[in-house]
Structure formats: C-alpha cells, structure tokens
Amino acid sequence: MANARSLVAKANNINVGSLILMALVFGSCVANGEYLGGRRGLAANSGNPTVYDITKFGAVGDGSTNTFKAFLNTWIQVCDSPVPATLLVPKGTFLAGPVIFAGPCKSKVTVNVIGTIIATTSGYATPEWFLFERVDNLVLTGTGTFHGKGEAVWKADGCGKKVQCNLPPTSLKFRNMKNVEINGISSVNAKAFHMFLVKTENVNIQNIKLTAPAESPNTDGIHLSNADNVSILDSTIATGDDCVSVGRGSNNVTVERVICGPGHGLSVGSLGKYKNEEDVSGIHVNNCTMIETDNGLRIKTWGGSDPSKAVDIKFENIIMQSVKNPIIIDQNYGSRGGDSQVAISDILFKNIRGTTITKDVVQIMCSKSVPCQGVNVVDVNLDYVGKTGGEKKSSSGGLVGALCDNANVIFGGKLSFPMCPK
C-alpha cells in the first residue's frame, strides 16, 4: 500500500486523503475483489449486482455534505466487478470533490448521473474535479448535471494568453482511455475547461449541454490534446472560451450539429505553445450553428513555436448569427513573438452563410517562415449587420472583405465580399 501511495503521489501530486483512497482503488482492482479489510464487495449479495448506488455507500444528497469518499468507495466496487457494472448517482444534490476514478477495471463501466453534482470551491491539489484515468470502455450518461461552481474562482483567473499559467480545475478530464461514450449529461459553470480529453482514442460525445457565462475565463467546452478518433455530435455549448478546441497531436476529429455560442468559436489550436508538439490532421467540422461568438471558425498557432503540421482541416455547412471574425487563421496568437513554425495546409471553408459584425469576413494571417498552403474559401455568404448586430445592411455592406498574408488562398463559388488581391 505504501508503494502504491508513493507512485500515485509522484504521478498526480494529490493530497493524503485522496492518496489513501486511490491506493484502495488500485488495490481493489487487482486483489480478487477484496474490499476494506478483506470483506467481499457488495456485488455478491446485492439484489441488483450490476448497479451500485452512491447513497448506499454513504452519499447524502443534501447539497452540503462532501460525498467524495462515497464516490470513491462506490467506484472500488464498480471497477472490481467481474461483470459490467454501473455507478448510479440518483436524484438529489451531491457535494463532491475532487474525485479520481482510476482503472484499469475488470469489466465495462457505466456512470449514470441522474442528480446534480456540485463542486467544492477549494481544496484542489490536482488540476481537475473529476478525473477518469485508464478506464477503457467507459460510458458516462444520464440527464444529470455537473456544476463546477466556477463563479467562485473566475475573478482570480489571470491566465489569458500567458505561456505559463496554472488554470483552475477542469470539471471532467479523461486521460489514457479508449472506447468512451459520453451522452446526455450537462456541465454548468466549470472553473476552467468543462471537458478535457488527453491521450484518448475512440471517443463519442453526443447530446450534451455545456454552459457558462460569456465572460467566464478559460471555460472551453471540450478541449482535445493527443486525442484520436473523436466525434462530438448534436450538442449545445455556450461558454466563455472556445466551444471546441482541438489541440496538439489530435487526429480524425468530427464535430457535427453543434450549436456554439456565446463563446470564442470552433477552434483548431492553439498549436505550437509547447516543445515538440505532435501534428494535427483530419479535423472536420460540419453542419454547425454559431450564435454571437467572438470568433467563428479559427485556426490559431503561437509565434516562436517548434516545427509541426496542421493538415486536412475542413469547415463546411456552417450557419452564423452576428459572429465576430467569422473565418480566421491567426499564426501570431499568444504573447511570445517570433514566427510560428506550424505548417498549415489543405484547409477548406465551404458553404458558410449568415451574418457577421466584422467587416473583415476572412482573415488568413499566416507565418512568414512557413506560409499557409492550399487554403480554399468557397461559397461564403455573410451579411454585415453592424458592430452590435441588428438590421441587415446592403449586400456590399461596406465590407473590407478578405485579408490575406503569407498564404496561398483559393477563392471559389459565390462570395459576399471582395477577395484578397493576388
């Protein structure tokens, strides 16, 4: 047990109470079902051996009793079950945090959230509220809500675009996992990211709702890092930062039928912030709606970056309502200076329609060192409606049109603005 505690401490730097519980989790998953002093888990005697209700393990749904130990004790049973098992959060309001659900588990695991889970406002030694790690074949489902209580910490968040900064805790992090299904749940007022997928593979997210005020800092809806084969479908994201941000080393990502806004748009990046970042490829955004977002469809890379690539990125069939900066590639993002070394190529913006509050409909501002190649802008019809939206202007609308720098841009189809001069 001491060795397990030491390993977890080095890996996660978490507090002593969580270390003890984490050690129990690891021990339970390899010790033939033994639980707390050699007693067998409850599965053998339960009337429904595959469903474990957190209230049977001490959770109190009064909104004020910290139930994180009940969550972890329930998880021990679920993870150790030899048959597929469900951790159930029933109706009620449960205060908890932080919670670590660690695997590997013996069988498929479902976490079914019906009630509301409220985060504590302090006591976080780790950068997440709920962490799922090494739990393959996980299903997170239900009609319930994760309330991050971000309003308690947003004023103290001074990260902005700083190179080095410790963000407040992410609400839901999934790390080192394969074959994950997330559907139906809601996340409200995350302290920072609502969801963060890192080193994951084969993840399907659908029918979720993520919300936070437009002014809440760094509250990305879903952030990906080294994530492969991810689908984000049929969801609503209204938050204070990117609705979806696709980060380094992510490949084969599909975003479809997502309503985004308020927020900072649907973004690839920022890329190039860290050393030796892996390439990004196969990002396809289709049939999405953007409402009063600060940016629309964006690719952003840091100046002074190490070399990497961002290729095969497609934004198609997008509706925009009073969107600022509808189409933008920004290779001077952040505060570091110097030319970006992220090579951007094979990019498509097609069938983008609606209204904008920015006269520069298209801004393709690429790196002098590695100019963008193969950027296609096709069938973009956006009407300028003034700085605050409202009445539709004439089709000319006083638009500046497109701005292009260090980029090979190919325009085609019907355009509502003047093209970049060749």
UniProtKB/Swiss-Prot annotation:
Disulfide bonds join 243-260, 366-372, 404-420. Keywords: Cell wall, Cell wall biogenesis/degradation, Disulfide bond, Glycoprotein, Glycosidase, Hydrolase, Repeat, Secreted, Signal. Glycans are attached at residues 229, 252, 287. PbH1 repeats lie at residues 200-226, 227-248, 250-270, 280-301, 310-331. Residues 1-31 form the signal peptide. It is found in: Secreted; Secreted, Cell wall. GO terms for molecular function: galacturan 1,4-alpha-galacturonidase activity; polygalacturonase activity. It comes from the Eukaryota. Gene3D superfamilies: Single-stranded right-handed beta-helix, Pectin lyase-like. This is Exopolygalacturonase clone GBGE184. It comes from Arabidopsis thaliana (Mouse-ear cress). The gene is PGA3.
